[in-house]
């Protein structure tokens, strides 16, 4: 990565930049050469004149440490002043605006807070490449997280780390390496030596302050690169303290400037999630955008690292993109299988919906980065959500506290709101299709059973979904069903999250159908508040016309007393701190996924093509291959994407009325955690058309 920074620096010429009044942004059209050196520490000056090479005597440390502290501070200010004068003279008389090799654009100093001067500048002769539609072509965003200062940490053992999020792709920045032998030597007083009022106690306290000052100003010097697939994207850098159980230290939202080889360098003030409160601390971030021509990717451009999931028609891999080393999830789908099962339309529909939701972004829906195909397979490349499936966490914890479940349900409501607003019915809401990112926010995935172009009161008839979450009208109504089926599934999900089992589960599928259509459910004792129970009853009303959400869709759900403490505006901007943060060590962490998959050896797996001899010997005909025309996702407008696809979105001709159902594999394992099915005898009854859902 450092080579890229240097390459961009050498490839462009700059003009002198006039520095404005102190602010928070420093941008250039050329790349200053960055050093991997950490900024000057206090101990760097211990060997200078006036410093003892033998450490110090703790008995006489108090006055000496104070004197040394003042000397160091004065020296830092002096060197910084000389450096600025030198750079100013160099830039004005000898330089063409390019920072000489081996120097710094700025070398931050410990114990000194200085906001760099601001300048926003780009050469007038810079050519900004555009595509044939007049839009800026896509490229790569290089990011360097330099350092922080004045972070709100209270312990010298603090381990500040960061999560950088861009277009839903997340990168973990580990805590900075601590040199155990570095810094001013620590003197540990003897147990029998008095501390109160002694010079030793005073020096120890001052030394602790210096150590804390060092910890509050971490130096990450971390570099990474992101694929840019849409303009106007923002980058979020969130800072946490691992030592204090992932305490949130603040975040910044940065809007990069997508001009070729444009450098943006700034100090950004950390902001709390609740803007009515204040936070200390700043971080220094640098970004460079690099334009690339339109590129068509294929499976050979990715390397499989782990298997993280497996389905009826293919597998999901953790992959690394070879040119940027960025980590993604790759869904590989066998063309032969979906043709044989008559699922071509559903599969292409999934891709279309991912394109639509990616271009009109929802923060709670997984983002599509690329899609492409070979003669035998289809490939969907999406953001990797390292927090794992919600199902995995529910399986391991049995059930969630109501507040945690409410947070997930609220974000799901916003995800469904986005889909319904765009006339999309989801139809497969279940824990396996809900992912968590590294911060603990949800992302809805797997749109294989979703249907687009379904207006508010329109109906559809396809019998599909996961058995335990099917709405009764899917089983009983010949006239079809509406988007209300998503709210029924949401009610089942709330019950399962809070109670620990599915309300309609039975070992026999036919019995499960009867339970959904006519069975009664009782809440367990001591679970769910009265508002929570009211919310579930409203969603599990068997009459879709009386169900919560039937009149005003998700607006009704958001106005329910169950969500009285939810600030929907802050939640939609991810400004509400999740109640649970997954344990994620790095970008390659798969510990939140099922080991049945992640322990699979992928070294011999060929993601480029099917290794099945049958597939190799009997290729698909040109007529069948033509059905997949337009699957590849490139940098085009959404209208062009759908025009290139040779079928209408609202067609469901492959498997109309054919049952595609799966039993929910989590039920037995969740019940095995020992959640007793004790019910509340005082729970009131809910009125429905098809029969009472809840038993008295």
UniProtKB/Swiss-Prot annotation:
UniProt-annotated catalytic positions:
428 (proton acceptor)
The annotated regions of Basic and acidic residues compositional bias extend over 38-49, 77-88
**Which stretches make up the AGC-kinase C-terminal domain?**
564-643
CDD domains, sorted: STKc_Sck1_like (cd05586)
InterPro entries, per this entry? AGC-kinase_C (IPR000961), C2_dom (IPR000008), C2_domain_sf (IPR035892), Kinase-like_dom_sf (IPR011009), Pkinase_C (IPR017892), Prot_kinase_dom (IPR000719), Protein_kinase_ATP_BS (IPR017441), Ser/Thr_kinase_AS (IPR008271)
Record's catalysed reaction(s)? L-seryl-[protein] + ATP = O-phospho-L-seryl-[protein] + ADP + H(+); L-threonyl-[protein] + ATP = O-phospho-L-threonyl-[protein] + ADP + H(+)
Q: Which UniProt keywords apply?
A: ATP-binding, cAMP, Kinase, Nucleotide-binding, Phosphoprotein, Serine/threonine-protein kinase, Transferase
Q: Does the keyword Acetylation apply?
A: no
Write out the GO cellular component annotations: cytosol
Q: Where is the Protein kinase domain?
A: 302-563
What EC number(s) would the UniProt record show?
Answer: 2.7.11.1
Domain C2 residue range list: 122-272
One GO MF term attached to the UniProt entry: protein serine kinase activity
- Mark the residues carrying the PTM Phosphothreonine: 632
Tell me where in this chain the PTM Phosphoserine is found: 665
Instruction: Name its GO BP terms in alphabetical order.
Output: cellular response to heat; intracellular signal transduction; negative regulation of adenylate cyclase-activating glucose-activated G protein-coupled receptor signaling pathway; negative regulation of conjugation with cellular fusion; TORC1 signaling
Domain of life assignment: Eukaryota
Start-end of Polar residues biased regions: 11-37
Region (Disordered) residue ranges read: 1-59, 77-118
The cross-references to SMART domains, in alphabetical order and at most eight, read: C2, S_TK_X, S_TKc
Binding-site list for ATP: 308-316, 331
Query: What protein family is recorded?
Result: Belongs to the protein kinase superfamily. AGC Ser/Thr protein kinase family. cAMP subfamily.
Function recorded in the entry? Protein kinase that is part of growth control pathway which is at least partially redundant with the cAMP pathway. Required for trehalase activation.
- Protein name according to UniProt: Serine/threonine-protein kinase sck1
Protein's organism = Schizosaccharomyces pombe (strain 972 / ATCC 24843) (Fission yeast)
